[in-house]
Structures are given as structure tokens and as C-alpha cells.
Swiss-Prot record:
Pfam families: TPP_enzyme_C, TPP_enzyme_M_2, TPP_enzyme_N. Its cofactor is Mg(2+); Mn(2+); thiamine diphosphate. Keywords: Magnesium, Manganese, Menaquinone biosynthesis, Metal-binding, Thiamine pyrophosphate, Transferase. It catalyses: isochorismate + 2-oxoglutarate + H(+) = 5-enolpyruvoyl-6-hydroxy-2-succinyl-cyclohex-3-ene-1-carboxylate + CO2. It comes from Vibrio vulnificus (strain YJ016). One of its GO terms (molecular function) is 2-succinyl-5-enolpyruvyl-6-hydroxy-3-cyclohexene-1-carboxylic-acid synthase activity. The keyword Metal-binding applies. Disulfide bonds: none annotated. This is 2-succinyl-5-enolpyruvyl-6-hydroxy-3-cyclohexene-1-carboxylate synthase. It comes from the Bacteria. Its EC number is 2.2.1.9.
């Protein structure tokens, strides 16, 4: 048998992708490159894998993040060697905080070409540090290393991911040649060493893990509890609402839940002493899901627990979500499973906090008076649920997501965010991944600075068919800094950084439709009309004065704070 390194490279990659498929991978995101040839060709050859391509590795990582976020499956990412690998770090860091399962397949030079001046070769081992839950540095493909070893080694990494979530890194050093027309059958005896695995269709080395179940909560029926719903699926949010209604408890809904309640606007009314005092009568807080937007809710929660209130946290993610380091009972299990056990018997509800909905209603009433039906961020947040309709919603990390947290009321909207590191990068790409995984129409709300940061990824929408509306709220820079105690002399130059740009020609560059409405009525007509009759992507630019949103928020807070 003549040695053909290119064929051997592809045999290893074929084996790798088949095992990834058996672990649940269905989508593979691929960037161009020569060293990654065996990975790209074998991903393409696997008939049950769907490929997504992008020329920008940073955007590619976020595209994969969105796919994983929406599909709840691991997603593979293929890049070539060198700085292509380093560009994945922002998305990997986000996944490390929010739990999406990315499988990073990074092509590399063989070890003898690293650290010696060879082209496009950097130190890739350990490049993602503790942002990944496990790493595997493969040897260069060779017949002295068995395919059995390859499978058990890959399985160990993927089982670790199954338990803890987050990204894993498999570094793949491929010697040249990278191209060959020879058939794989020239190594048939080597391939046949795992023939039984190929025929049976299961994971090569399986692990069974017990499912943790929640403890009984019969003893808490008579307690005054508050239910907090964080970043969860819409179905989980609905189950949590049913549970709270059954128990007679108030519900505080983060916008990431896609739901609202009679206690909405809490980020504002928690500033009112009477409202805060009533909510503080609770003796148990049950939080479903991670990553709350409201800093004020975090502060109230911290004060309550420090005063002796019990704090339960339900999330399948083993990682802690406890930024104040409070005493906490963490139920590491499926939210749906926990709720199914808890709600399987009759209880006698003990309703309380009945005065708080009055404050919520006042927040909504006053917000509408302040906005005065004008085209502003507060008015858009108030009408967001009707704008999105039956489409999915992606909220960026600008001032607007906080506005939604303060005054928005989402009535059963599947909502997605990147609220791990809460970066302003990769939001176009992440939203594209979510939309591809779900195949639903989508409304994306993004700030102008975030949009500038990820302009490359508008290319992902160039051939969009399903209706997508991208709303860029353009307040000319970082208006959020109006809400922070930054030095006023340097606020504009060092924090807000006004740019003066508009996005019409960015839309044209990537073949997207574009409108810039001047009234709330026109905005509504454009968005609703595109979802009803349009196709592809529509970029809607909403220009607002730089300090308008922050002034509206301060007006609203001042009014509600003074209520008695």
C-alpha cells in the first residue's frame, strides 16, 4: 500500500464527523481555508449534515452560537490554521457563559511546523483557555494511531460537553499533501478496525448519567414566594407562569423569557419605597434560568437573601450563576422536569403582593405619556409585542434591551439574546444562526454601535428568503453612558463616541431592502407589512436624539419613585 497522507487525513475527518453526528451535531459552520480541506470536504460529504459558510471567522463563530442557541444541539465549527482560530474567541467566550455547545474543529500545521517560522502557524493548543470545558489536541493522522483511540478520545470530550455544556476544542494538525483523488479503500483494513461501530450506528463509548430530580416542595405551599423568570425557552416560561399562578405568587419576567405579567416594569417600580417594601415581604425567591438584565432586580435579590430570604435557582447548567455569592439552592436539572414534578398535585394558593400591579399599571401609563406616540425607543419598546407578532425576537445588547426590561410587555414571544458576556459584537451573525435553526420570521433589534461592529455579517442575510426585519436604533453612539456616572468632560469623546453614520449604503452593499421611517405609524406599517407580504431581509433605521432615551427613563423613574 502506497502512503497517501491526504486520504488518511480524510479518513480521520470522516470518522470524526460521523461520531459528531451521533452525538447530535446537525449543522457545521465552515470558513474558507486550505489547511482545513479534509474537515471541509468530509463535512460536505456527510449527507445528514447541513453546512453554513461565512468568510469571516469571528462572524462564523457567532453564527454557530445562534444555531446552537436555537436548536439546543451542538454545532461544529471548521476553520483553517492561524489567526482564523483566534477569531473564534469572542463567540467561545459567550458560549462559555451561556452554555451553548460549540465543537471547534481547528485545522493546524503539524507539530514540526509550529514555532519555527512556518507560514500561518501559531500556537493553537490551549488558545481558548478556560473558555472551553474540554480540549483535545489530536496527533497528525497516521495508521500507527488506531481509529479506536480517535473515537474514545473524541467521545471523552463530547461526554464532558454533554454534562457541562459550553464549547469544546479539537485541534487537528494535518500534514501535507492535503489534496488527493485516491479512494479511501487503499486503507480498507485500517477503516475496518471500527467496522462494527460503523454498522451499529451508536456512540462508540457511551456513558449513562443519572437524572437529578428536585426535592419535594410540599412544605412551601404557605410561604410568600416570588418567581423570577430569566433566560429560558418560551415553553419553560409558560410552565413557570402556570406554576406561579397555581401557587398564587407574583412573577417577575426578564425580557429574555418572552413573557410578561401583572408585575411588569419592576426595574422602575422597585425604586418606589412602598412597592419595594411590599415585595420585600417575600421569604422565598425561585429563579428559573440565567442572566437577568435588570441590575436593580439583582440588587433587590441580594438584599432579600442577605436578610434571610431563601433563594432557589433552577437551571440545567452546572455552572454557578450567583454574582453576589449568596447562599443558594441550585437544582441542576431540566426546568421542565422540575416543574412537572412540582405541579403534579393540588395546592391551596396563598395570593399576596396584590398592591403591586397598581405600580406596574402606572409605569405603563406614564411611559405612554412620556413617549407621546412619537417615534422613540420608549414607544417602540411599549409596542414591541405587537410589532413582532408571531415572529421570533432577537434583542441586542444596547440601551434598547434595558428599555424593554423597564417598560416592554412581551406576550408569548420566543426571544433570544447574547447576555453572557453581553458584548456588542457578533449580533447580526448570532441572530442569523437563530433564524436558520428555527426557519421562522424574525425581528432583530440592535443598536447603531453594535451594528457597526458586525457589518460583515450582513452578508449572511443577502440570500435570505424568510422575512427578517433588522431594526437599527441609531442614537449616534453609546447613549447608554448617559445612565452611568462617567466623567462628563470625557463622556462624548471616550464613551459615547458619536460617529454620524447612517446605514442606507450598508444595506445596499449587501443587497438588503432599506427604509428610514419618520413616525411610529410608518414604522409599524413597514414591519407588519414586511412580515405579512415581504421576503428576505429589511433593514429599518430609526434615528433618535442621542440623549432622548436616557431622559425618558429618568422622567419615568422620577414619577414612579414619588408615588404613594
Amino acid at each position: 500500500m502506497n502512503h497517501d497522507q491526504a486520504v488518511l487525513n480524510r479518513i480521520w475527518c470522516e470518522t470524526l464527523f460521523e461520531e459528531l453526528y451521533r452525538f447530535g451535531v446537525r449543522d457545521v459552520c465552515v470558513a474558507p481555508g486550505s489547511r482545513s480541506t479534509p474537515l471541509a470536504l468530509e463535512a460536505n460529504a456527510h449527507t445528514s449534515l447541513k453546512l453554513h459558510t461565512h468568510f469571516d471567522e469571528r462572524g462564523l463563530g457567532f453564527l454557530a452560537l445562534g444555531l446552537a442557541k436555537a436548536s439546543q444541539r451542538p454545532v461544529a465549527v471548521v476553520v483553517t490554521s492561524g489567526t482564523a482560530v483566534a477569531n473564534l474567541l469572542p463567540a467561545v467566550a459567550e458560549a462559555g457563559l451561556t452554555g451553548e455547545k460549540l465543537v471547534l474543529l481547528t485545522a493546524d500545521r503539524p507539530i514540526e511546523l509550529v514555532g519555527c517560522g512556518a507560514n500561518q502557524a501559531i500556537a493553537q493548543q490551549g488558545i481558548f483557555s478556560n473558555h472551553v470545558c474540554a480540549s483535545l489536541n489530536l496527533p497528525s493522522p497516521n495508521t500507527q494511531t488506531s481509529l479506536n483511540w480517535l473515537l474514545t478520545s473524541v467521545d471523552q470530550v463530547l461526554h464532558q460537553q454533554a454534562v457541562s455544556g459550553h464549547a469544546v476544542h479539537i485541534n487537528c494538525p494535518f500534514p501535507e499533501p492535503l489534496y488527493s483523488n485516491a479512494p479511501k479503500s487503499i486503507y480498507q483494513s485500517y477503516i475496518d478496525t471500527v467496522a462494527v461501530w460503523r454498522a451499529e450506528g451508536g456512540i462508540y463509548s457511551n456513558k449513562q448519567m443519572p437524572l437529578p430530580m428536585p426535592t419535594s416542595i410540599a412544605e412551601i405551599e404557605q410561604r410568600k414566594a416570588v418567581v423570577v423568570i430569566g433566560s429560558v425557552t418560551l415553553q419553560e416560561a409558560k410552565q413557570a407562569h402556570q406554576f406561579a399562578a397555581q401557587m398564587g405568587w407574583p412573577v417577575l419576567c426578564d425580557p429574555q423569557s418572552g413573557t410578561t405579567s401583572d408585575w411588569s416594569g419592576f426595574d422602575i417600580w422597585l425604586q418606589n419605597p412602598a412597592a419595594r417594601a411590599q415585595l420585600s415581604q417575600c421569604d422565598l425567591i425561585i429563579q428559573f434560568g440565567r442572566r437577568l438584565v435588570s441590575k436593580r432586580l439583582h440588587q433587590w435579590l441580594e438584599q432579600q437573601v442577605q436578610a434571610g430570604c431563601d433563594y432557589w435557582y433552577v437551571s440545567p447548567d452546572f455552572e454557578r450563576d450567583n454574582q453576589s455569592h449568596l447562599p443558594q439552592q441550585h437544582f441542576v436539572c431540566s426546568i421542565a422536569a422540575w416543574l412537572n414534578v412540582v405541579t403534579n398535585r393540588e395546592v391551596q394558593p396563598v395570593a399576596w403582593a396584590n398592591e403591586l400591579p397598581r405600580f406596574s399599571a402606572e409605569v405603563n401609563k406614564q411611559a405612554r405619556e412620556i413617549a407621546q406616540s412619537s417615534l422613540c425607543e420608549m414607544m417602540i419598546a411599549l409596542h414591541l409585542s405587537s410589532l413582532v407578532g408571531s415572529a421570533d425576537l432577537f434583542l441586542g445588547n444596547s440601551l434598547f434591551v434595558r428599555m424593554v426590561d423597564m417598560v416592554g410587555q412581551l406576550h408569548g414571544v420566543e426571544t433570544f439574546t447574547n447576555r453572557g458576556a453581553s458584548g456588542i459584537d457578533g449580533l447580526f451573525a448570532t441572530a442569523s444562526g437563530v433564524q436558520r435553526a428555527r426557519s421562522n420570521p424574525m425581528l432583530l433589534m440592535i443598536g447603531d454601535t453594535s451594528a457597526l461592529y458586525d457589518l460583515n455579517s450582513l452578508a449572511l442575510y443577502s440570500h435570505q428568503e424568510t422575512p427578517v426585519v433588522i431594526v437599527v436604533t441609531n442614537n449616534d453612539g453609546g447613549a447608554i453612558f448617559d445612565l452611568l456616572p462617567v466623567p462628563p468632560q470625557q463622556k462624548q469623546a471616550l464613551y459615547q463616541m458619536p460617529h454620524g453614520y447612517r446605514f442606507e449604503f450598508a444595506a445596499k452593499q449587501f443587497g438588503l431592502d432599506y427604509v428610514r421611517p419618520t413616525s411610529m405609524t410608518e414604522l409599524t406599517e413597514r414591519i407588519v407589512g414586511h412580515f405579512a407580504h415581504g421576503c428576505g431581509a429589511l433593514l429599518v433605521e430609526v434615528n433618535t436624539p442621542p440623549n432622548q432615551a436616557s431622559q425618558h427613563i429618568k422622567q419615568l423613574a422620577d414619577h414612579v419613585r414619588a408615588l404613594v
